[in-house]
């Protein structure tokens, strides 16, 4: 998780096909 926090502008494609920002995902997980 710490590594992801260094790249807040990255996006991640979710299994359902949506793209979410890594920062948003880490916020949801946290």
From Swiss-Prot:
UniProt keywords, alphabetically: ATP-binding, Hydrogen ion transport, Ion transport, Nucleotide-binding, Translocase, Transport
Disulfide bonds, paired cysteine numbers: none
Superkingdom classification of source: Eukaryota
Catalytic activity: ATP + H2O + 4 H(+)(in) = ADP + phosphate + 5 H(+)(out)
UniProt enzyme class: translocase
Residues making up the signal peptide according to the UniProt record: none
GO MF term (any one): ATP binding
Record EC number: 7.1.2.2
The keyword Ribonucleoprotein is assigned to this record: no
Keyword Nucleotide-binding: yes
GO biological process, one term: proton transmembrane transport
Similarity remark: Belongs to the ATPase alpha/beta chains family.
Subunit and interaction comment: V-ATPase is a heteromultimeric enzyme composed of a peripheral catalytic V1 complex (main components: subunits A, B, C, D, E, and F) attached to an integral membrane V0 proton pore complex (main component: the proteolipid protein).
Described purpose of this protein according to its UniProt entry: Catalytic subunit of the peripheral V1 complex of vacuolar ATPase. V-ATPase vacuolar ATPase is responsible for acidifying a variety of intracellular compartments in eukaryotic cells.
UniProt miscellaneous comment: Two separate genes encode the catalytic 70 kDa V-ATPase subunit in psilotum and equisetum.
Protein name: V-type proton ATPase catalytic subunit A isoform 1
Record organism: Equisetum arvense
């Amino acid at each position: 998780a710490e590594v992801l926090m260094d790249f807040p502008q990255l996006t991640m494609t979710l299994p359902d096909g949506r793209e979410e920002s890594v920062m948003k995902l880490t916020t949801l997980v946290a």
